[in-house]
Amino acid sequence: MSTEKKQNLQDTFLNSVRKSKTPLTIFLVNGVKLQGVVSWFDNFCVLLRRDGQSQLVYKHAISTIMPAQPVQLYEPSADQDD
């Protein structure tokens, strides 16, 4: 068994937008639209910051996350054709 820890797509995405402070729009399952920047996250929730205010959003309530700009999650390899 490998000791190397693999990161899932959700954590990779959230960590990338957190580090780059990319503005997001988060849609909840009830239709509410939230906007802000991810300042922290764990397995169960996301801390969203906007205008000096923080909102703790539970992941089970999130439907969709839309970044305001494209997010590059990995370095494209030289052998890929785009």
Swiss-Prot record:
InterPro entries: Hfq, LSM_dom_sf, Sm. It holds the Pfam family Hfq. Residues 11-71 form the Sm domain. One of its GO terms (molecular function) is RNA binding. One of its GO terms (biological process) is regulation of DNA-templated transcription. GO terms for cellular component: cytosol. Belongs to the Hfq family. This is RNA-binding protein Hfq. Homohexamer. Keywords: RNA-binding, Stress response. RNA chaperone that binds small regulatory RNA (sRNAs) and mRNAs to facilitate mRNA translational regulation in response to envelope stress, environmental stress and changes in metabolite concentrations. Also binds with high specificity to tRNAs.
